[in-house]
Regions:
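Short catalytic-loop micro-motif centered on adjacent basic/acidic residues
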Residues: 240-243, 306-311, 393
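Active-site/ligand-binding-proximal alpha/beta "capping" segment
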Residues: 308-336, 343
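Catalytic or ion-translocation cores adjacent to nucleophile or general acid/base/metal-coordination motifs
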Residues: 202-226, 230, 236-240, 246-303, ...
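Residue-level detector of anion-binding/catalytic polar loops
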Residues: 263, 328, 391
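Glycine-rich beta-alpha junction loops
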Residues: 271, 313-316, 335-340, 396-402, ...
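Solvent-exposed alpha-helices and their adjacent loops that cap or buttress functional pockets
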Residues: 146-148, 164-168, 183-184, 232-236, ...
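Short, solvent-exposed amphipathic alpha-helical segments in soluble enzyme
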Residues: 258-260, 323-327, 408-412, 519, ...
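Long, compositionally biased, glycine/small-hydrophobic-enriched stretches that function as flexible linkers
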Residues: 1-195, 199-210, 364-514, 518-530, ...
Length: 660
């Protein structure tokens, strides 16, 4: 059977052969068995409803075995035999070009070069899922191949609820992930609901079909590292950036360090993750001995090298070794998946990767205890380095939050954290308040020449806009022009032919309009526009994206909800809203979109309407929180567009409130 026919078939009419568990693939950690006997029966009943009754007797013991062995029912048997990667848009069976674009994006999220745990449908972050099981994937692809531009596919946490009549102006797909009643949003609730097969953690771009490989975060990481060095007034050359994690998102750190021209040391316990990044040229060297690492780093400091080193082992050992050997760490952070601390997101010091994974399911209580002890030790050594002059920041992975829960020495006397989130110090005031965020695009032709043309177009647009840019955004413009000029040389593409670029509202709109013109003229194929959820307007997250909101509203989620609703009727091809993402389940509400543009007048209208809202909604909220940069930026936006009317805050003098 050829690819198109297999996709259009969906769940096969006859049972495919069982799949052999492939030890060469990076698999998800075994999840804790949290279900009672009655709940296990319910999980099996839930899984079996995808299949004809005649197969139930054969599938029950198989699914029961998966549930007991892995803590989840993945339905490995139904993983398709065809290769999983982003194909040219015309290769997908379709009645709707927009639906074909979504199929391309889904397959990219599950490409083994891109996805962290492809056979468990996990794209990044340890538990960031596209689907809960392979039946959901097959059924979704079938619906997408059938649908027209007058239908909308509704996705409930990976489950395709069905095609519903809509209109050409409606989204083709509406995605929700992990939407639960607030009182049932604890991490233990997620484990139970996910094991039952009724909810999932979509992270950000995993469950919304907008992941573009580690490139998706490397630009933001580069901006963060560059501005961190600027903040401490140090030239990056010969200076150290110490961090951890080489997974789907964290794997961007060594590449970003090289682009920033510093010495990057990134610890990772999973050798497969290291091998993946090393083979992709995202990290230069691999060392598994702290003595050798110390020697190598001292030489790199002496020679002011630009080099990235993966240390195979625990980050705590590196911090302690550097302290003992008087190695100055200029910038420090952490990007382990601490949003998921009990299921392999963070590995305790003193255990090998294999030992820790075994402990997760054999003795989860002890594993949790060891993680907490490790976090205490981690914080203790970071505190010592900070006293020596290290600038340490939380990289939005819940490090500060989980360390505080572990009762580590991470709080000031007033109960606030000792260290800032990178959004508080860098990304918020320098980027988000001005509307700069991770705009991205994917060439649906999958041609390198199309990507090259879009790079050139984007650069030309930015250079033109930079000529009239206000002083408070000129540095951001210049950083992004330099980024796009060096993008191809830096070999950023893993998976689909995609690019990320931090741009403000005006930049995103003008770049997209220039793409649309090039499509109309036949220079390039259709383009899929999108962004990370980690952006100006898309995410309410008090420990990350909205951590530089100080009016008390950082714990509210009106912005993210308003954003996805607004995107849905302004021209988005698909929209998504998730519980969790970045900092973790119950801590965040975040959303995103995808928009296929095809050179048409309709695409032009959608670009101007939706991209304007998608950025300025967040600037308006940040302005109301009294953020100076956002007040300036939204005022400029109102001058440019007379239809925009935003409420500006009246600032009260501090002395008037001193005696209250």
């Amino acid at each position: 059977m050829n690819f198109k026919k297999e996709v259009a078939l969906g769940i096969p009419k006859e049972l495919p052969n069982k799949k052999i568990y492939d030890p060469n693939v990076n698999h998800a950690p075994i999840r804790e068995n949290v279900l009672t006997r009655e709940e296990k029966i319910l999980a099996l009943r839930n899984a079996l409803r995808y299949f004809d009754k005649k197969f139930h007797k054969e599938l029950i013991p198989e699914f029961k075995s998966e549930l007991e062995k892995f803590g989840r029912i993945y339905m490995y048997r139904f993983r398709p035999d065809y290769k999983m990667y982003a194909r040219p848009i015309e290769d997908y069976p379709h009645n709707s070009k927009e639906a074909a674009g979504i199929m391309l994006m889904i397959q990219n999220n599950l490409d083994k070069r891109v996805a962290q745990h492809p056979h468990e449908l996990i794209t990044y972050g340890g538990n960031g899922a596209v689907f809960q099981n392979w039946a959901q994937y097959l059924l979704t692809m079938r619906y997408l191949s059938e649908m027209t531009d007058e239908q909308t596919l509704v996705m409930y946490s990976g489950h395709p609820m069905g095609l519903f009549p809509s209109s050409k102006n409606a989204p083709r797909v509406v995605v929700t992930n992990g939407m639960v009643i607030p009182n049932y949003s604890k991490k233990s609730d997620l484990e139970k609901f996910n094991a039952l097969g009724v909810s999932q953690y979509g992270q950000m771009t995993a469950g919304s079909y907008m992941y573009i490989g580690p490139q998706g975060i490397v630009h933001g990481t580069t901006i963060t590292v560059l501005n961190a060095f600027r903040k401490i007034n140090k030239n990056p050359k010969g200076k150290i950036f110490l961090t951890s994690g080489l997974g789907g998102m964290s794997g961007a750190q060594p590449k970003a360090g090289n682009i920033s021209e510093c010495i990057t040391i990134c610890a990772e316990v999973n050798i497969k993750a290291i091998e993946t990044r090393h083979s992709q040229n995202w990290v230069d060297e691999v060392i598994d001995d702290t003595e050798k690492l110390v020697e190598r780093v001292k030489n790199a400091q002496k020679n002011k090298e630009i080099v990235s080193i993966a240390y195979h082992g625990n980050i705590v050992d590196v911090w302690e070794s550097f302290y003992e050997n008087n190695i100055t760490v200029d910038i420090g952070s952490d990007q382990t998946s601490l949003h998921n601390p009990w299921s392999g997101g963070y590995y305790p010091v003193g255990y090998s990767f294999e030992e820790a994974n075994k402990l997760i399911y054999e003795n989860p209580k002890k594993f949790k205890s060891e993680v907490k002890l490790s976090l205490k030790r981690h914080v203790e050594i970071v505190n010592k380095h900070v006293k020596r002059g290290t600038y340490f920041f939380d990289y939005g992975n819940a490090f500060l939050l989980e360390a505080s829960k572990a009762e580590a020495d991470i709080l000031k006397k007033d109960g606030s954290f000792k260290y800032p989130s990178y959004v508080q110090d860098i990304m918020g005031p320098m980027c988000f308040d001005y509307g700069f965020g991770p705009f991205r695009w994917v060439c649906s032709s999958c041609k390198q020449e199309d990507l090259d043309i879009t790079d050139t177009i984007a650069c030309e647009v930015l250079e033109k806009l930079a000529l009239s840019a206000p002083e408070d955004t000129k540095q951001q413009m210049m950083d992004n022009i330099q980024w796009i000029k060096a993008a191809k040389e830096n070999e950023l593409v893993v998976g689909s032919k995609a690019r990320i670029l931090y741009a403000d509202s005006n930049g995103r709109i003008e770049i997209a309009k220039a793409f649309n013109k090039a499509i109309k003229e036949g220079k390039i194929g259709p383009i899929i526009l999108g962004r990370d959820h980690h952006d100006v307007s898309g995410t309410d997250s008090p420990y990350r994206e909205t951590s530089n909101i100080y009016d008390g509203s950082q714990f509210t989620a009106d912005m993210a909800i308003q954003n996805v609703i607004g995107d849905s009727f302004r021209g988005a091809t698909w929209v998504s809203i998730h519980n969790g993402g970045g900092v973790g389940w119950g801590e965040v509400i975040n959303g995103g979109f995808g928009m296929l543009i095809d050179g048409s007048e309709k695409s032009e209208i959608n670009i101007e309407s939706m991209l304007f809202w998608d950025v300025n909604n967040g600037i308006a909220r940040r302005n109301w929180a009294r953020n100076k940069g956002a007040i300036n930026q939204i005022s400029r936006a109102m001058q440019k567009n007379p239809k925009l009317k935003v409420t500006l805050p009246n600032l009260v003098e501090d002395k008037l409130l001193e005696n209250i």
